[in-house]
Amino acid sequence: MNKILFYLTLALGFFFLSGCEQTTNKYLDITANSEDKIVIETQDVTTKAEFLNYKVDDVTIQLIVVRGTDGKVRIAFNTCQVCSPSPKAYFIQSGEYIICQNCGTKFHINKVGEEKGGCNPTPVEEQTTEGNRIILSKSYVESFKDKFADWQGQTN
């Protein structure tokens, strides 16, 4: 009986510890500047994704910014292209992957913002890069408001 309890405890401990992969996500609020630009500083972006909340009226539009394992900074809207407009069509990070909370599809962080179409985060197609800054126009970001109208992703 003691052997069974030992192995059961060991199995449960392994089960709970294996679920403790890196899942703490970082959420930040962003705003547009006086020139109607959203400026994202990238020098401190790491392989741990940052989820950036931009508020327009009563809707939160969320962006994912992450540095891939190849060193390239990537950005995308945090809504799944296929699962949207489901309220659960958003991603969280677990280790080097992001996972759709609606369908469970998993992507390596190197794919964030790289693929148009399919079950992955919506690419940010209108952006400019100046040194360590990604610059987006306020009007472009706000044009995605309808995609986030029923969105229920985490914001903090």
Model-predicted regions and their roles:
Residues 13, 73, 93-96, 112:
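Residue-level signal for mature regions of secreted extracellular proteins and peptides
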Residues 16-19:
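C-terminal motif of bacterial Sec signal peptides marking the signal peptidase cleavage site
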Residues 1-6:
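Bacterial N-terminal signal peptides that target proteins for export
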Residues 21, 81-84, 101, 120:
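Secreted/luminal cysteine- and crosslink-motif detector
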Residues 86-94, 105-113:
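Iron-sulfur (Fe-S) cluster-binding segments and ferredoxin-like electron-carrier domains
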Residues 94-103, 114-125:
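Short cysteine/histidine-rich metal-coordination sites, predominantly Zn2+-binding motifs
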Residues 23-92, 125-156:
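N-terminal pre-ligand scaffold of iron-sulfur
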